């Protein structure tokens, strides 16, 4: 584990009160935990916008009865085989499936995969969750 550094932060009263409410609503034990998470989120966002390496999950639901949808989903996934590291498929009911695709790679590639899958007719919902790969 790395060394822990302490530093002071000056905030106006209304901002610290809002931050404390945020901490309480998220069940953090202290301000340091919440601040660490906010910094990490911002660093991941920076990697995303600058095209760094990210890891995450594409989560989508779709109607597998839509004509040619499954074939198109598979074609796109094969086009991104360097980005996709695993996938899991779940049958929600007779008509609908849930697919979770684990990804790792350049942020732009991950975004392109997500956008291509989301644009297909029959994909009901798609969300992308990213984190730092480092």
Swiss-Prot record:
Binds 1 nickel ion per subunit. The keyword Transcription applies. Its cofactor is Ni(2+). Pfam families: NikR_C (PF08753), RHH_1 (PF01402). Ni(2+) binds at residues 78, 89, 91, 97. GO terms for molecular function: DNA binding; DNA-binding transcription factor activity; nickel cation binding. One of its GO terms (biological process) is response to nickel cation. InterPro entries: Acetolactate_synth/TF_NikR_C (IPR027271), ACT-like_dom_sf (IPR045865), Arc_rbn_hlx_hlx (IPR013321), CopG (IPR002145), CopG/NikR_regulator (IPR050192), Ni_resp_reg_NikR (IPR022988), Ribbon_hlx_hlx (IPR010985), TF_NikR_Ni-bd_C (IPR014864). Keywords: DNA-binding, Metal-binding, Nickel, Transcription, Transcription regulation. Transcriptional regulator. PANTHER family: NICKEL-RESPONSIVE REGULATOR. Belongs to the transcriptional regulatory CopG/NikR family. This is Putative nickel-responsive regulator. It comes from Chlorobium phaeobacteroides (strain DSM 266 / SMG 266 / 2430).
């Amino acid at each position: 584990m790395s060394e822990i550094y302490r530093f002071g932060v000056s905030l106006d009263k209304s901002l610290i009160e809002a931050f404390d409410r945020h901490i309480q609503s998220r069940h953090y034990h202290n301000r340091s935990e919440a601040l660490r998470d906010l910094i990490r989120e911002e660093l991941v966002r920076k990697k995303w916008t600058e095209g760094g390496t990210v890891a995450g999950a594409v989560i989508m639901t779709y109607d597998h009865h839509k004509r040619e949808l499954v074939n198109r989903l598979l074609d796109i996934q094969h086009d991104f085989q360097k980005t996709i590291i695993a996938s899991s498929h779940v049958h929600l009911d007779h008509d609908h499936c849930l697919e979770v695709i684990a990804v790792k790679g350049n942020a732009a590639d991950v975004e392109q995969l997500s956008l291509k899958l989301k644009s297909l007719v029959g994909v009901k919902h798609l969300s992308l969750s990213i984190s730092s790969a480092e």
